[in-house]
Swiss-Prot record:
EC assignment: 2.1.1.228
GO terms classed as biological process: tRNA N1-guanine methylation
GO cellular component: mitochondrial matrix; nucleus
Family: Belongs to the class I-like SAM-binding methyltransferase superfamily. TRM5/TYW2 family.
Protein name: tRNA (guanine(37)-N(1))-methyltransferase
Keyword terms: Cytoplasm, Methyltransferase, Mitochondrion, Nucleus, S-adenosyl-L-methionine, Transferase, tRNA processing
Species per Swiss-Prot/TrEMBL record: Plasmodium knowlesi (strain H)
UniProt subunit comment: Monomer.
Matches recorded under PANTHER family: TRNA (GUANINE(37)-N1)-METHYLTRANSFERASE 2, TRNA METHYLTRANSFERASE
Main location per the UniProt record: mitochondrion
Broad EC category: transferase
Length: 698
């Protein structure tokens, strides 16, 4: 064992050196987590103190009337300081105290720039000032004196002869103040300092020590965060073509525009150059930059949070337990659209896929509205499952499904798939066992003015059994006769559903509703007034509080629906059950002849495979071994039923898992099956969807 240790000792030292080098570069070190930079971060005030920083950099001293001309130059603009919420042009009067005493340095840099431009082929004579004296090196090193020294010696002599010393001093002060008022400072960034250093070193010259040379991540483009768009610097990276022999581009050769254009402007316009020291802090940084500053080795983990309307949902690992509240305060403070920051306390294990919420910062308000593909979605995040990260998958399904398809969504949540696909004139049967989700499905149908979505609050098995009873899977069935509940009667438009024209609108349903009712409703005025009042509560404006929404429960069996609604008043303790007639239904005929394939959506990755056995009855009904009285195979009389079954699996086992579960539940495998990776839940757990035609299962 001792000899084994001696053999491993050199490797141990190499590993330690590697970890140290990674930590110095601010890179992740796998299991070696360095958190010492954040140990004393307790409050937002601590954060603001920690992120204070200074930049010492070059700046241009420009007359205010020439600033716009300078800023318009795209190549020059690349080298201007661009800091979040910090002005790119400063008033000299306000920042005079930030200018540094540099001795001969300013003049040396200016002479270098002028001579460099002349060697490249001129650049024009600058307008105004004493160009020759600057080019020869006779440059005043105090900027305040530089901007005042515009009068000729003859003018100064005449004034001195005519005025007393006191008057002369007063006049000089006035001229100095006026000159300072007209001057602006344009700070330059680390890219300029870096590129200038490279150029001057090639000629044996050095730039001042202590200048900012740190190229921020923002210098290479905008910074983005998964689940949400962050406010950030908009640093322009203009692609510039140039010929050989011009000014070198600098350290990032091939990406930076040449300094030549900026040098020419400095010489032509008689612009001074100086050194300025600027203070930056919390207000000049976005969320991403602040978190990188505090947690330099861990920030990529923190940044991955989900946005649900005004709610930011974070998933913290244990090592951030002591910092989660201050991180939440940063996110809340730096993103004005965020009002609530929460942490997920546990995994999704219950029937309704909800989780315990820990409020970290902001309002305790989980009723939110979000927008996806021009669809408004209202939900209570505490009561209903929602995942913004599945937007790409919802878009993929939308592109996959043809117009006039039939959608069967077993685990619909707030109904986002149906809300989206109803744009394509699809007839949608949308179900969720969560009564809160069912309630918001109906709210969102009204909110988005959808006309072809039928909603159900059933166990998935009972839901599919109901559809089997309606025989919507038969390709020979052209008319679907069914009884609709009051809620679904309000959700749909028969004119819209029964017309292949997507622009068709309902013109008469509301007027003939009473005459179409199968059930009997008492006709007296008092009863109608009560029902109207409750309808107002049930279909209140979407800006009303959640307490005024129905917590409706519906039970449907073989095409007949019963509904019982529960109303909440502003006082949570007062609850009244609506005596809306449970047996009131509406007989409707739906033209199935205009609809094509059926798409069954099973987005419950944890257990969706377990529900596939529901469709065994369908396979038995349309068996390949049975023929009708005309001798046709029964399977040919079945519509195409495309199954989209979502599941979790390890990346190395996903196909075997899908095949095993499908064979187990359906007793066979489809001829063809497509499996698509949806997203990575963790390194060893991915989400997939298995897609196949149920008609092809043998």
């Amino acid at each position: 064992m001792f000899y084994g240790f001696l053999l491993l000792y050199p490797l141990l030292s190499l590993c330690l050196e590697h970890v140290i080098s990674l930590s110095k570069k601010g890179k992740p070190t796998l299991g070696f987590v360095i958190m010492r930079n954040a140990v004393d971060i307790k409050t937002l005030s601590d954060v603001k103190d920690r992120v204070k920083n200074e930049k010492r950099t070059h700046c241009l001293v420009v007359n205010k009337y020439k600033v716009n001309d300078v800023l318009k130059n795209k190549e020059a603009k690349f080298y201007f300081l661009n800091v979040f919420r910090f002005p790119s042009v400063l008033k000299l009067r306000e920042y005079e105290g930030n200018l540094m005493e540099t001795g001969q340095y300013n003049g040396e840099v200016l002479r270098f720039i002028h001579s460099y431009v002349e060697r490249l082929g001129g650049g024009g004579t600058h307008v105004g000032g004493k160009a020759d004296s600057k080019a020869d090196g006779k440059v005043n090193h105090d900027v305040s004196d530089q901007v005042v020294a515009q009068q000729t010696d003859q003018q100064m002599d005449q004034q001195m002869d005519q005025q007393t010393d006191q008057q002369m001093d007063q006049q000089m002060d006035q001229k100095r103040d006026a000159a300072l008022e007209d001057c602006r400072l344009i700070p330059l960034n680390a890219r300029f300092n870096k590129a200038l250093q490279e150029l001057m070193q090639r000629e044996g010259k050095e730039i001042m020590e202590g200048l900012d040379m740190h190229l921020e991540e923002g210098d290479a483009g905008n910074v983005t965060v998964e689940g949400v768009a962050m406010e950030d610097d908009s640093t322009a990276h203009d692609s510039v073509q140039r010929n050989e022999g011009k000014t070198p581009k600098g350290p990032l050769d091939g990406q930076w525009p040449p300094l030549e254009e900026l040098f020419r402007i400095i010489k032509k316009e008689g612009i001074q150059i100086s050194i300025i020291q600027l203070q930056f802090g919390y207000d000049n940084m976005n969320t991403s930059e602040i978190l990188r500053k505090i947690f330099p080795t861990e920030s990529e983990v923190i940044h991955k949070y989900e946005m649900i309307g005004h709610i930011a949902h974070l998933n913290f690992c244990e090592r951030f337990e002591n910092y989660k509240k201050v991180i939440a305060e940063i996110i809340l403070d730096k993103n004005k659209s965020i009002k609530t920051v929460i942490n997920k306390m546990d995994t999704l294990k219950n029937l309704h896929r909800t989780f315990n919420i820990e409020l970290l910062a902001g309002e305790k308000n989980y009723l939110t509205t979000l927008k996806e593909n021009d669809i408004k979605v209202k939900l209570n995040y505490e009561l209903i499952y929602w995942n913004s990260k599945l937007k790409k998958e919802r878009d993929r399904i939308y592109d996959l499904v043809e117009n006039n398809s039939i959608i069967v969504d077993l685990f619909a949540g707030v109904g986002i798939f149906s809300l989206h696909l109803s744009k394509k004139k699809c007839l949608c049967f949308s179900n969720d066992i969560n009564s809160h989700a069912y309630n918001f499905m109906n709210v969102n149908i009204k909110l988005n003015k959808r006309k072809s979505i039928l909603t159900y609050n059933l166990d998935a098995r009972a839901f599919v059994q109901m559809l089997l009873g309606l025989d919507i899977f038969s390709s020979d069935k052209t008319t679907l006769s069914m009884q609709l509940s009051e809620q679904n009667w309000k959700n749909i438009s028969l004119d819209f559903i029964n017309s292949p024209d997507q622009n068709n609108v309902d013109t008469g349903k509301r007027k003939k509703r009473e005459s179409d009712r199968v059930g009997h409703v008492d006709d007296d005025i008092t009863a109608n007034a009560t029902i109207d009042k409750k309808k107002k509560l049930r279909h209140a404006d979407t800006n009303d509080p959640l307490e005024e929404r129905p917590l409706g429960l519906a039970a449907t069996h073989h095409g007949e629906e019963n509904i019982q609604s529960v109303e909440r008043t502003n006082n949570d303790s007062e609850k009244t059950k609506e005596d809306a007639p449970r047996d009131v239904t509406h007989q409707v005929d739906i033209n199935l002849g205009i609809y094509g394939d059926i798409h069954v959506l099973m987005n419950l990755p944890q257990t969706a495979f377990e529900f596939l056995d529901i469709f065994r009855e369908l396979l038995d009904t349309y068996s390949t071994d049975q023929k009708d009285f005309q001798g046709k195979c029964r399977r040919d009389q079945m519509r195409n039923v495309f199954i989209h079954c979502y599941f979790f699996s390890k990346p190395e086992l996903f196909y075997e898992d899908a095949e095993r579960n499908i064979r187990m539940q359906l007793g066979g495998l489809p001829r063809e099956m497509k499996i698509t990776e949806i997203r990575k839940v963790s390194p060893s757990k991915l989400m997939y969807v298995a897609e196949f035609n149920l008609k092809d299962v043998f």
